[in-house]
């Protein structure tokens, strides 16, 4: 379908890092199709909301944005509004009935269709491309990323784990991996463009399985580390059951792989983990934590936690608090449970915990974790850390902000450093969420 060449588009990205990576893919596809990037949402001929369906409040945010765009459309009759990503994949064509402002829908596997969808929308057809395509990994597309220090490189898409609370398998489809050769080609392009950090992405990144040669994630991680010796390497998100000793060795043995592992646990109760269909109990989880700490001294661990899942009792909640005290995570993403349509929990488990109890338990988790996080930061005072400078500090142009390999935010005096530099910083102060330090000098670009 033909469309008007040169129309401008703006992508409003919600949710996870994978969505940010997908927005870069969408940008490349549309630019290749003759569209151009608008400087702002107000200036755009086409606005695309790239959406997240993981939590109920994410859907509410999209609803508010669509209400705003309804007013924008009254002022600019030619404006097209598209919704991409997980929400349309979850709600299907019902979204078109719910929100008349929407002109087209695209699921996570159909972004190559966007130029044609826009062409149909210009003719008033309100098209939707929402099928799953198990072969689609967007290999061969060179994402058009925003300017910055770090680059996201997706290596898996979808998820096969079927955790009871999680909508991802129903919005992202079955798990599939990028070919090893495609990942390495993308890593080379990222290095050539001068990025200082590469984050390998997947809904369950450490289940990576190369479809061509069968390489696992540990093998891929080592190869990326060797190919990009001047880049810091991160990965997310991990599933605890797929953290292998070989993967831990790869992190421990490679100087440019960050000593930070995001290890979602969701609950400290084995009974709740079983109800959540997580595939492991708390003892196995703690064995993985012990392995990481034994092989990688100073490793930073972060996690995800859900308060008030179906059937959670006081003793289950207390087990979660006990886990926080034992593991002492650097940080955590913490939420109370909200049922998601179509999931196993929504279909088979009663949402028995009252909302007030969920909120109270969540607050107790937050309060405890914030105190632990503050203590962890305070322990860093007096140490010298390797920081990748990301940007100017919001407080002063004379300061830079960056992150350590353990993913701690650090603000320090600029000196002669610039965003993208590795900087040695002496930590002098810790607040509740940020470290402050003194610039000790720019470090060599290559890790050793």
UniProtKB/Swiss-Prot annotation:
Location within or outside the cell: Cytoplasm
Similarity-based family: Belongs to the methylthiotransferase family. MiaB subfamily.
Known EC number: 2.8.4.3
Domain TRAM: 378-441
Residue ranges annotated for the Radical SAM core domain, each copy included: 145-375
Pfam family membership, one: UPF0004
Cofactor: how and how many bound: Binds 2 [4Fe-4S] clusters. One cluster is coordinated with 3 cysteines and an exchangeable S-adenosyl-L-methionine.
Oligomeric and partner information: Monomer.
GO molecular function: 4 iron, 4 sulfur cluster binding; metal ion binding; N6-isopentenyladenosine methylthiotransferase activity
Residues reported in the UniProt entry to bind [4Fe-4S] cluster 1: 16, 52, 86
Job of this protein: Catalyzes the methylthiolation of N6-(dimethylallyl)adenosine (i(6)A), leading to the formation of 2-methylthio-N6-(dimethylallyl)adenosine (ms(2)i(6)A) at position 37 in tRNAs that read codons beginning with uridine.
Annotated protein name in UniProt: tRNA-2-methylthio-N(6)-dimethylallyladenosine synthase
The keyword Repeat belongs to this UniProt entry's keyword annotation: no
Binding residue positions for [4Fe-4S] cluster 2: 159, 163, 166
Sequence ranges assigned to domain MTTase N-terminal in this UniProt record: 7-123
Signal sequence range: none
GO cellular component annotations of the record: cytosol
Database matches in PROSITE patterns: MTTASE_N, MTTASE_RADICAL, RADICAL_SAM, TRAM
